[in-house]
A protein has these predicted regions:
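Active-site loop ensemble at the mouth of alpha/beta enzyme cores that anchors a bound cofactor
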Residues: 166-173
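N-terminal glycine-/serine-/threonine-rich phosphate-binding loop
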Residues: 1-43, 65-75
Length: 290
């Protein structure tokens, strides 16, 4: 596997690992490298179905030569890596709650085609099934205890074509962006989806939007809460997330990150289009249930 090969290369003292693939491949490689004290640099040539991580790093997607040229600029950043229960690692997002659990009923072929969250555009009918549950969430600034329908712990701003779920997320600040969704009301959820496209959800009354270097999520009921880590099943809560600050040195498009805008190649619009379609279908559902 990519994880085993990355671990072997790291142990052998290689200076550089080049990951050619999508988010899943990068996750495996980072997971292979992360347990070691001395780690090689990482370069990415995005060739996968979903390339959210490359999007966050402003690396040209579906253009291997452009990605190689970017690597040649020799711009690197020591990025944060998430760790789950001192075991698994993730590079983009961890999530839990009702929506996460319902997504496991969506056929895997759709997940393969659209990536985590983006493929939910094909499953907007899941929204009426979302339910809240009581949890205790411990973070750097205190404790939240109450009912939530879902939560997200994000390392980057880009998730499945939704580029403003965590609009102020930074790659190297040592902090997760923690988002707690406090409603299961269909109309309020539909409104939130529209807000996510614009990034205006962060101030909504149904959202707790926080920054934290560590997060612990504990269910306060007997109902199981499944965790999703970078789009894959990551066990059940209680769960602790730890931010490994500046853990991997990676080649990035530093000019674009500093300018805070996206490359916008025409071939790279697919996920944005899916995200927009999700919002449109949500609006349509909102009209139908009135």
């Amino acid at each position: 596997s990519a994880q085993k090969e990355a671990a072997r290369a790291t142990e052998a003292g290689f200076d550089l690992i080049v990951a050619a693939g999508g988010d899943g491949t990068i996750n495996e490689i980072v997971s292979g490298m992360s347990p070691f004290d001395k780690r090689p640099k990482l370069a990415i040539i995005p060739t996968g179905t979903t390339n959210d991580f490359a999007r966050a790093l402003k690396i040209p997607r579906n253009k291997p030569l452009a990605a190689v040229e970017m690597i040649g600029k020799n711009q690197t950043l020591n990025i944060d890596v998430g760790q789950v229960n001192d075991a698994e690692y993730f590079i983009n997002i961890a999530a839990g709650g009702s929506l996460t659990e319902l997504t496991y009923s969506v056929p895997s072929r759709l997940k393969t085609a659209f990536g985590y969250l983006a493929y939910l555009a094909k499953g907007v009918d899941l929204l009426p099934q979302i339910r809240k549950r009581k949890v205790k969430v411990t973070h750097d600034d205190g404790v939240f205890e109450g009912e939530i329908s879902m939560f997200f712990a994000a390392l980057t701003n880009s998730v499945g074509g939704f580029e403003k779920i965590a609009p102020d997320a930074k790659l190297d600040d040592g902090l997760f962006t923690l988002i707690l969704v406090k409603t299961d009301n269909l109309f309020e959820l539909l409104a939130l989806i529209s807000m996510v496209i614009k990034g205006s959800h962060v101030d909504d009354v149904n959202i707790e939007y926080l920054k934290s270097s560590q997060i612990k999520v504990e269910p306060l009921t007997d109902k199981k809460m499944m965790i999703n880590v970078d789009g894959e099943y990551g066990g059940d809560a209680p769960v602790t997330f730890r931010n490994l600050h500046g853990h991997i040195e990676i080649f990035v498009n530093l000019d674009e990150i500093n300018n805070d805008h996206y490359l916008g190649d025409e071939e790279e619009e697919d996920l944005e289009a899916v995200a927009q379609k999700f919002a449109e279908e949500a609006e349509q559902l909102k009209e139908e249930v009135k």
